[in-house]
Amino acid sequence: MRQDIRFLLNGQPQRVSHAAGDLTLLGWLREQPHLRGTKQGCGEGDCGACTVALGRPDESGQLVWSPINACILFLPMVDGAAIRTVDGLAAADGQLHPVQAAMVAADAAQCGFCTPGFVMSLYVAWQNRDGLGQDSIDDTLAGNLCRCTGYRAIVSAALALAAPDVHSPADRSDAAEAAALAALCAAGDHDDDLVVDQGATSFYAPTTPAAFADFYAENPDSVIVAGATDVGLWVTKQHRTLGQMLWTGRVPQFDRVVRDDDRLFIGPAVTHQRFADAIAADLPELAELMRRFAAQQVRSSGTICGNIANASPIGDLPPALIALGSAVELTRLGAVRQLALEDFFIAYGQQDRAAGEFVSGIYMPAQPAPHLRCYKISKRFDQDISAVMLAANVDIVDGVITAPRLAFGGMAAIPKRAAAAEAALIGKPVEMTTFQQAAVALADDFTPLSDMRGSAAYRMATAQNLLVKYGLDLSEGQKFRLAGAGLASVMERW
């Protein structure tokens, strides 16, 4: 076993041998190398002030960069990666990086606290040659908040960076960094299991499925960590001592998206962003939900199976996967079983999962679902928890509804299908009266609660309206969307 965390920081090799398993990347950056350009804002992966760039090599050895929230990512999770912070962008002679220069030219900083995070999100887009246009800049910056509301100047800087003649591809070369990372990872023991056990919390990162399953069967109270977008908050906001953590991220077989004739398998380490890319062509409706589900920082770290395993009453993704007829795979040692995803959720905080058993994958249909619609109602358009979520899917044969699947989030203690409303749709024509009658039946399916995101009456009325909206989508042959114009589009009119 290996006990040192190895990564690149602004191009320089790092080996960290003495660290607590639950030390965050942000905590280490600010206290050890004293790189304090990266800021702590919310401490929960929401504001983006802590954004840094994380690069991992693709199959060709080139680095692919992602923005991540350093405030909730545990330091051992950057093992084998390249990290770049705002402190490392300028050249040794002090010349600003093109992203920094564009921000200065656009007067895009006010109080300046959020500026490093915005710079790093734009840096990732600049490195990847994607996400700086008018049609994509909103998504690029959705995970960064500016309390001074200086967004217009920041967007202007981004659009300036998108000009094709501003910077040559040579400016973006990170071949030397990729080579340095490859050399760091070439040590004979690099592929050994990683153990970080300083302090009260230890962090174990096995490299094979068998080692992972064996450890969890022997230590069923371990906290499984995938992207830390949920577990990270247990440390930063709830101040919990986690004891033993078990990470999925160093098992290559866990990071798989496998397509066969009629099903798609999603492994336990597959991120939201990779999943969205894999299903975009066949399931554009679901891909659009993924864009609203979370900003790029969270999509780049959080995983599909982690979202299922934490069993949120809303979750956004579980209703959509239930509407598609997906199944969850559970593993304990050599025993593997599958069950329908809606049967996995039993009650609030309770799933059909035995001690030592973990979510080892999701199976979902691989073919397009032309009648799938996903409706997310939240106070913010991007990166917000839903008040009500509806994922609806039906088959239509000769104008008649068959096999309806209506799955709601935010209406019960678990993501749940609406059995009475589904029964009201079966065998009925695709017309508005059908869906109006089904909407009335929702009162037999749910007794929602009131909380800070909405009253019980609001949730019921919204759920009924969403089902009628689905009927409009199908019967009128057009889509009705609650979509914002976007910052770049608004700027065109100013």
Which residue stretches match the model-derived regions?
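Short structural boundary motif marking the start of a folded domain
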Residues: 1-7
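A basic, amphipathic helix-loop patch mediating RNA/tRNA/ribosome contacts
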Residues: 20-52
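Short Cys/His-rich Zn2+-coordinating modules
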Residues: 30-35, 95-96, 128-131
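Short, surface-exposed linear segments at secondary-structure transitions and domain or protein termini
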Residues: 23-28, 74-82, 346-354, 382-384
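C-terminal structural segment of proteins
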Residues: 8, 13, 53-57, 63-69, ...
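Helix-adjacent hinge/juxtasegments
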Residues: 52-89
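Short, contiguous acidic and Ser/Thr-rich linear segments
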Residues: 12-21
